[in-house]
Amino acid sequence: MKADKLIGLIQPKKGNVNSILDLHETGCLGKITSFKDMLDGRYLIDLSGLARFKVTKEIKNNKSYRECEISFEDYQDDLIVKKEKLKFSDLELIFKDLKSLFEKKGYIINWKSLEKQNLNETINALAMASPFSLEEKQILLESQNLEIRKNKIAEILSTYSYDDFNNTTIQ
């Protein structure tokens, strides 16, 4: 952690019965902004997401962590700062539903602080901090751009709002 403070994060796939879990193809490169040693030997880390990547190959090793060869080719736009066509006003309904969901789940969010960030950072932070399932967060991570991610968040929120944000399974 002393070198460049970069780490790649990839979620395991759900429903895996192997002792070594299969990984999703898409992950995110993050920069460690702070970390703390916990008394039980774990680390508590804060990350800033930099760019998404695709796993091209997993490298076998005997380490306590997994290593992969990755490509940023599909997500080159993550590295370019660009003006988004969306405005905060385009997201009023989504923010209203997210606030309801976060309150229902007991999350405390500083909305004023979020609105000071650029729209892309705000949407990404809310998507990853949300009480969505790992599969739902993976769908958001893989969304190609902010407009698609906004629409996916709206779709996910509509399933939660159906049962007043209790997220009970409907069959």
Give the positions of each predicted feature:
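Core structural elements
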Residues: 114-132
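Short helix/strand-capping connector loops at secondary-structure junctions
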Residues: 131-141
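Extended, Lys/Glu-rich alpha-helical coiled-coil stalks
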Residues: 105-117
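Positively charged
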Residues: 1-108, 139, 146-149, 155-171
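Small/polar glycine-rich anion-binding or flexible loop at a beta-alpha turn
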Residues: 116-119, 141-146
